[in-house]
Amino acid sequence: MIVRDLSQAEKTDRRVVSKGWESTRLLLKDDAMGFSFHITTIYEGAELPMHYKNHLEAVYCISGEGSIEDLATGQVHEIRPGVLYALDKHDRHVLRGRTQMVMACAFNPPVTGREVHDETGAYPLEAEMA
């Protein structure tokens, strides 16, 4: 059994801070769950173009408001508490925080914890990081 406290994990290298967001990775690849699980904060006013070419992601909004734009269709979906979106086709998107948003995120394959977004907004595969 794995038990982790978010407030404790935030004080470790599981917390990653970047421009427009921060994320605490509560489950990582080494936990052998088949996915990683993160609590991510999107800062108010952030506009984050992303394209997870190597990962699928599901995101549930806990608090805050914003939007996600599907760059293939131009469709914009509102995000608010209780809304989930799933990037099931490696969707190119822009995430915008109208207010600070707290999100619960699951990634498959799981991240290792060392990833940073590349110039296209993607996380590389672990093999590409070696």
Curated annotation (Swiss-Prot):
GO terms for molecular function: ectoine synthase activity. The keyword Transmembrane helix does not apply. It comes from the Bacteria. It catalyses: (2S)-4-acetamido-2-aminobutanoate = L-ectoine + H2O. Pathway: Amine and polyamine biosynthesis; ectoine biosynthesis; L-ectoine from L-aspartate 4-semialdehyde: step 3/3. It holds the Pfam family Ectoine_synth. Its EC number is 4.2.1.108. Keywords: Lyase. GO terms for biological process: ectoine biosynthetic process. It is an enzyme of class 4 (lyase). The keyword Nucleotide-binding does not apply. Gene3D superfamilies: Jelly Rolls (2.60.120.10). PANTHER family: L-ECTOINE SYNTHASE, PTHR39289. Belongs to the ectoine synthase family. Catalyzes the circularization of gamma-N-acetyl-alpha,gamma-diaminobutyric acid (ADABA) to ectoine (1,4,5,6-tetrahydro-2-methyl-4-pyrimidine carboxylic acid), which is an excellent osmoprotectant. This is L-ectoine synthase.
